Amino acid sequence: MLKQIFIGLVVFYQRFISPLKAPSCRFYPTCSHYSLQALEKYGPVKGLWLTAARVLKCHPFHPGGYDPVK
């Protein structure tokens, strides 16, 4: 149940907030898609941990690139 809540929040972000912003994610898949994959694969605890680590890497001094959920 908790996993579905977090997935719903990410989907809400993708549908209603992300389109209002200019594309800025330096990674593929995007941070929100990465979050969905991490939540599906690992559940809410590890999925949120991986999402937080990924978002913290998303800054101008990191080169970005291909970074799949492992």
UniProtKB/Swiss-Prot annotation:
It is a peripheral membrane protein. The keyword Membrane applies. HAMAP family: UPF0161_YidD. It is found in: Cell inner membrane. GO terms for cellular component: plasma membrane. Belongs to the UPF0161 family. It comes from the Bacteria. NCBIfam families: membrane protein insertion efficiency factor YidD (TIGR00278). InterPro entries: Membr_insert_effic_factor_YidD. Disulfide bonds: none annotated. Its main location: membrane. Pfam families: YidD. This is Putative membrane protein insertion efficiency factor. The keyword Glycoprotein does not apply. Could be involved in insertion of integral membrane proteins into the membrane. Keywords: Cell inner membrane, Cell membrane, Membrane.
